[in-house]
Amino acid sequence: EIGLLNLMPNKERTETQFSRLIGATPLQVNLSLVRITEHQSKHTSEDYLKTFYQTWEEVKERKFDGFIVTGAPIAHIPFEDVRYWNEMLEIMAWTRTNVHRTMYICWGAQAALHHFHGVKRNRMEEKAFGVFRHRIVNTRSPYLRGMSDSPMIPVSRYNDIDRASVGEDLEVLVDSDIGLCMLGDKGGRAVYFLNHLEYDNRSLADEYERDVK
């Protein structure tokens, strides 16, 4: 049982990207699409959401083997000013009791690192954007099994993680010259992926066209 909390505006595209990755496993996986209860989507119809998604309130009594929290295009907003931040706090606390392992992506990773570990983020002078070579720091991590030693990973973010605020309760798993990419709890219950393993071959091009308008 895997849950996907989809915070992205284009929910159909994001769910397809993650479904493609999850579908590559030989295991039989049941994917539940989840959305924030308190937030009204401007880019996905309510009919679509009611048909294919459940709110977090509707799934919070369930147990999940894995839970994915996506990014969100709100990098410029302080965490506490995000409209659905209180619900995010409840969800992050809930993952500690109802989820075996959680993966946080991009903004989701920044938010969870801030909440659980007090990790600070810094606004970059320019947006980190493109496909960059990365370094595997911990080759023994089960999360990185089958990954090359120097993977090329899509990056699209305005903020960077303050390395000095990363404490001993976290382990750096993947690093790069463009910044930290992946960290994990020492207990192995959560991983924080600051870039975009889910992006397809059009994602960066479409973001570029959006940004230059």
Each language-model region and where it sits:
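Amide-donor transfer/coupling interface in amidating biosynthetic enzymes
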Residues: 1-38, 53, 59, 63, ...
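N-terminal beta-loop-helix "entrance" segment that forms/cooperates
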Residues: 37-50
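Cysteine-nucleophile active-site neighborhood
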Residues: 69-138
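Residue-level signal for well-ordered alpha-helical segments
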Residues: 44-46, 72, 111, 149, ...
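Short glycine-/acidic-enriched loop or helix-start segments at secondary-structure transitions
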Residues: 14, 43, 78-79, 113-115, ...
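Conserved phosphate-coordination/catalytic loops
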Residues: 47-50, 82, 86, 155
